[in-house]
């Protein structure tokens, strides 16, 4: 047992009760030792991850790193929502899927991947699109939403459902070499409609098919979204509420812009 594991377990076995909100089992103390020894993290933050229910809308480019990192981090329950199937052209950036998954529903492929990575979590695949008929029912049972979609109709719907239910939402988007992300937390900061009051003109934003997508920037932004999710779920750090983080893969680093709720 290395030093980090020894410090995490503190030399004692934990109560073996996954349903308990007061203890981690010894297996978890070992698996998540590098989290637990972090300053400001500890067993309490890890327990919060274990007890969290997270809805990930979209199991494509952004959904791939989001799902992999949240499952590895120890989120206890993941709902994966996507109505699309894996296409070979997806594999350049949608790293949760394999060649053998081509033609399979993305939600099912992603569920298999996260359970291979962490067999101790519960993963639910929902092969459907977020719509007016299911949005509130899906969102209300979760502690956090991650919007990994690629169209404004679904983005507005996810944000509106988050606002109605009071559920925080981590949002991200990719355009060629660039990405953006933010956290929309009802009653704590502005929402998506404050940032984008109107849908951008259809011809102003090229699709991935037409304009292309730089694979590594998808991983960058998706990993940052997973970081924001962990901050929201555990209470560590400062989530990007009221902040728009802009990543330019051809430059160096990222820049952060502030925005506020529309007074109207």
Specify the residue positions occupied by each region the protein language model found:
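Adenine nucleotide-associated cytosolic modules
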Residues: 1-264
């Amino acid at each position: 047992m290395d030093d980090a594991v020894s410090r995490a377990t503190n030399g004692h076995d934990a109560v073996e009760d996954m349903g308990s909100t007061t203890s981690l089992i010894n297996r978890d103390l070992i698996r998540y030792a590098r989290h637990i020894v972090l300053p400001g993290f500890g067993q309490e933050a890890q327990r919060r991850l274990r007890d969290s229910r997270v809805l990930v809308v979209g199991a494509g480019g952004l959904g791939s790193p989001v799902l992999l990192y949240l499952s590895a981090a120890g989120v206890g329950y993941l709902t994966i929502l996507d109505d699309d199937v894996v296409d070979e052209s997806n594999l350049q950036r949608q790293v949760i899927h394999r060649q053998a998954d081509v033609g399979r529903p993305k939600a099912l492929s992603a569920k298999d991947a996260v359970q291979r990575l962490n067999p101790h979590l519960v993963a639910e695949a929902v092969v459907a699109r977020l719509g007016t008929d299911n949005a509130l029912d899906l969102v209300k049972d979760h502690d956090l939403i991650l919007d990994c979609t690629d169209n404004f109709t679904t983005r507005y719907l996810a944000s509106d459902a988050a606002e109605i239910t009071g559920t925080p939402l981590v949002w991200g988007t990719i355009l060629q070499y660039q990405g953006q992300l933010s956290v929309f937390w009802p009653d704590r900061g502005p929402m998506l409609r404050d940032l984008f009051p109107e849908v951008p003109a259809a011809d102003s934003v090229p699709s991935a098919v037409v304009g292309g997508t730089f694979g590594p920037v998808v991983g960058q932004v998706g990993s940052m979204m997973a970081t924001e999710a962990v901050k929201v779920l555990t209470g560590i750090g400062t989530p990007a509420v009221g902040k728009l983080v802009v990543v330019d893969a051809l430059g160096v680093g990222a820049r952060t812009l502030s925005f506020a709720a529309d007074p109207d």
